Amino acid sequence: MIIKNGKVFQEDGSYKVTDLYVENGRIVASADEVTDKTELDASGLKVLPGLVDIHSHGAVRHDFSDADVDGLRTILQYEKSHGITSYCPTSMTLPKEELLKIFQTAKDVEQDETCARIVGINMEGPFLDPVKKGAHVEGYIRKPDIEFFRACNEAAGGMIKLVTLAPNMEGSEEFIRELHNEVVISIGHTAADYGCAAEAMKEGALHVTHLYNAMNSMGHREPGVIGAAADNQDCMVEMIGDGIHIHPVTVRNTFRLFGDSRVVLISDSMMATGMENGLYELGGQEVTMKDRKATLADGTIAGSATCLFDCMKCVISMGVPEREAILAATANPARSIGIYDEVGSLTPGKWADIVLTDEELNIVKVL
């Protein structure tokens, strides 16, 4: 296939009116490498890389933690239709036996061209700090456990790309030292202070789970996890872009503070995404969703009800430059989990995960 005359998003964040060549599901460098010369006229359209959501629990009344193959496939189809072509289903804090079944599901689900591609699993619990548990069930939280993690990853067929860890919990130092070369270790759901967080980053935990949420605020005398992440140029930070979790001023300032290569937009979406107001569930707890805000009975925000593409558009509406928002939803998440050689930009050799939009970033077609 040849996609003609589109405004193609470049690796540097600029647009260039050019043709894009696809052969056997991959982007190639020239028309000479294309056997199927079918043309798709993209005149007047923007051509974006498919989005990469590394932190999402579910959508359309299904949750990864349901351990349901058909439900997971439905989530993947929803995500693909909304411009998310690479996806990390994300678990909650649950008993070990349940987690093993959940991770097996990701290995077993049938995927085709209607689905977002599973590029890894995000293991958000159970190695969290009860003080900052958020919407996770405290009774299932446990100390960092290397063998527990490895059992889960074995059940997942080695697909776990990311694991959240509270570095102030007993056993975290050994966990980071032992596993930081096997999996991306993300600091999150923690009351850790700056010193603790900075030391964890020094040991190899160079990612932060949903910055600002489920951690202490940054103070001028105690900068905490946020300050440690800002100070470490190798640290990537997730940020929920739904317009509910974080104030627009903070969103804009985060991009200024961390630059255009370290912010990873995520949805943190749960099963209410794509649904109407009503009652739903997350991690075994009842959640009320009203006007895209999902909360537990005590008012705690319980994930988002917004897909990543809409999160990206939301942060643009807050004043974040379009190029930075798109990079934060494509290249940056791909880099953060080590898959940028396959996805995240429209570069020859990578998967032809392509989203066509109008000038206002309304989706026209997902390839």
Stretches with model-predicted labels:
Residues 57, 61, 73-102, 116-129, ...:
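Divalent metal-dependent hydrolysis catalytic cores, especially in the metallo-beta-lactamase
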Residues 45-69:
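Di-metal (Zn2+ and/or Mg2+/Mn2+) metal-binding site signature of metallo-dependent hydrolases
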Residues 123, 130-146, 150-224:
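Divalent metal-binding pocket/active-site signature
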Residues 95-101, 168-170, 186-191, 240-252, ...:
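Active-site glycine- and acidic-residue-rich loops that bind
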Residues 6, 335, 345-367:
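C-terminal cap of metal-dependent C-N hydrolases
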Residues 1-48:
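Histidine-rich, glycine-flanked metal-binding segment
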Residues 50-52, 186, 263-266, 355:
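Residue-level marker for buried hydrophobic side chains located in beta-strands
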Residues 196-324, 329, 335-340, 360-362:
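Active-site-adjacent C-terminal substructures of enzyme catalytic domains
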